[in-house]
């Protein structure tokens, strides 16, 4: 009889344990990272400055790639630092993917610029694309900060 009561008690405790565990939230994404947020925001400012400068230089000799190599070097360094940071954070795959895509976009921008000066129309489209990519990264970080679901 006591063995039966002991088994019933164990089953009850197991059931309570399972119910408690099922009520726990499973975290599948990293927490908000203020340094990533700040670094991405700083990069966005640098990108905007670059696009405004290149747009103002359209048709002038100053628009050439060779006059903007320092920007590309600094942007690559900034993105590399951001990439290293986001890869060091556990459960941060979405942010890693977005930063990788942003790095690819920067490489493509540089290759396009090496072919010749960017036209005002190209600058408008490129700036919009970079703003969208950066906004997506910031939205994800801010959603992490609020603890809200991403969907």
Language model regions located:
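C-terminal motif of bacterial Sec signal peptides marking the signal peptidase cleavage site
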Residues: 19-23
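Heptad-repeat alpha-helical coiled-coil/4-helix-bundle sensor or tether segments in soluble regions
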Residues: 86-113
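Short, charged, amphipathic alpha-helical segments
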Residues: 62-73, 95-100, 121-128
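Bacterial N-terminal signal peptides that target proteins for export
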Residues: 1-13
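Post-signal peptide N-terminal segment of mature Sec-exported envelope proteins
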Residues: 31-55
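Alpha-helical segments in soluble extracytoplasmic regions
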Residues: 52-91
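Bacterial signal peptide processing site
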Residues: 25-28
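C-terminal amphipathic alpha-helix
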Residues: 105-151
């Amino acid at each position: 009889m006591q063995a039966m009561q002991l088994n019933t008690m164990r089953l009850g405790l197991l059931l309570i344990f399972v119910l408690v565990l099922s009520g726990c939230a499973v975290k599948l994404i990293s927490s908000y990272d203020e340094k990533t947020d700040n670094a991405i925001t700083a990069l966005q400012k640098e990108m905007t400055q670059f696009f405004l400068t290149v747009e103002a230089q359209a048709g002038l000799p100053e628009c050439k790639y060779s006059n903007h190599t320092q920007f590309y070097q600094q942007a690559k360094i900034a993105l590399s630092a951001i990439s290293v940071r986001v890869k060091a954070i556990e459960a941060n795959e979405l942010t890693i993917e977005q930063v990788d895509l942003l790095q690819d976009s920067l490489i493509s921008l540089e290759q396009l610029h090496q072919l010749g000066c960017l036209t005002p129309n190209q600058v408008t489209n490129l700036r919009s694309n970079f703003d969208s990519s950066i906004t997506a990264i910031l939205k994800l970080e801010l959603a992490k900060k609020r603890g809200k679901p991403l969907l």
